[in-house]
């Protein structure tokens, strides 16, 4: 006689219920992971215990992405099946869904900030660590890219300034050379004019000076002759007597 199907019902014993929940939860998360890997399916699993503790699993840790996809799909289905304006949405249900989504996002944010980690299992902590490592890699990559771009821009500006300085130095050197040549030419022209002005000229006074001295000597001699003429006979008279 075959074994009959066991009727499922709530376990009354609290300890047994907690043990069964722990075992079935582990198996459920494992099955969700297996179907995600084997069938390449996007799986999102959310479980709340009787104490309100959250347990979740999502393919590649993309719970928000899967929930967004679910919301879009559900909205499209409701739009297709709606027959009148009154059946287009239950605002109360929408509010509950949005509230649950906000709570999930806030909880994920606290986890990323290192808060409320006591409720996470080892697998969930490993997934969180992997997400943080991936985020850090992206942040470091972006930071290095910005630093490289900044260094490249500074090098480009430095090269442009160096080229400009070289051009200015060349212009200054050419101007100094021109000024030096002009100064040299002016000095040469000034030296030629000064030399021609200072050359001695032959003056007639030199010859005239010699004539003047000869004439003066002759005149003085004549005076002496005139002076000696009256004296000479007297001397002669003395000698005769």
Swiss-Prot record:
The keyword Nucleus applies. Gene3D superfamilies: Transcription factor, MADS-box. It is found in: Nucleus. Residues 88-178 form the K-box domain. Its main location: nucleus. Expressed in tendrils and flowers. One of its GO terms (cellular component) is nucleus. SUPFAM superfamilies: SRF-like. It holds the Pfam family K-box. One of its GO terms (biological process) is regulation of transcription by RNA polymerase II. Keywords: DNA-binding, Flowering, Nucleus, Transcription, Transcription regulation. Probable transcription factor involved in flower development. This is Agamous-like MADS-box protein AP1. It comes from Vitis vinifera.
């Amino acid at each position: 006689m075959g074994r009959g199907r066991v009727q499922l019902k709530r376990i009354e014993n609290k300890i047994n219920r907690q043990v069964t929940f722990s075992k079935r939860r582990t198996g459920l998360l494992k099955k969700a992971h297996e179907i995600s890997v084997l069938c390449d399916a996007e799986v999102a699993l959310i479980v709340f215990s009787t104490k309100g503790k959250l347990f979740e699993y999502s393919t590649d840790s993309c719970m928000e992405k899967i929930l967004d996809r679910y919301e879009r799909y559900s909205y499209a289905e409701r739009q297709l099946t709606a027959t009148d304006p009154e059946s287009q949405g239950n605002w109360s249900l929408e509010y509950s869904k949005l509230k649950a989504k906000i709570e999930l996002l806030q909880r994920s944010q606290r986890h990323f900030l290192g808060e409320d980690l006591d409720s996470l299992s080892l697998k969930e902590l490993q997934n969180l660590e992997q997400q943080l490592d991936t985020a850090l890699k992206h942040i470091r990559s972006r930071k290095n890219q910005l630093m490289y771009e900044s260094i490249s821009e500074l090098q480009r500006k430095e090269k442009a300034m160096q080229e400009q300085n070289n051009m200015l130095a060349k212009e200054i050197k050419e101007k100094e050379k021109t000024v030096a040549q002009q100064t040299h030419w002016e000095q040469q022209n000034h030296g030629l004019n000064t030399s021609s002005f200072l050359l001695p000229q032959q003056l007639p006074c030199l010859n005239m000076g010699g004539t003047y001295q000869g004439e003066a000597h002759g005149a003085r001699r004549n005076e002496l002759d005139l002076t000696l003429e009256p004296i000479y006979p007297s001397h002669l008279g003395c000698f005769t007597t």
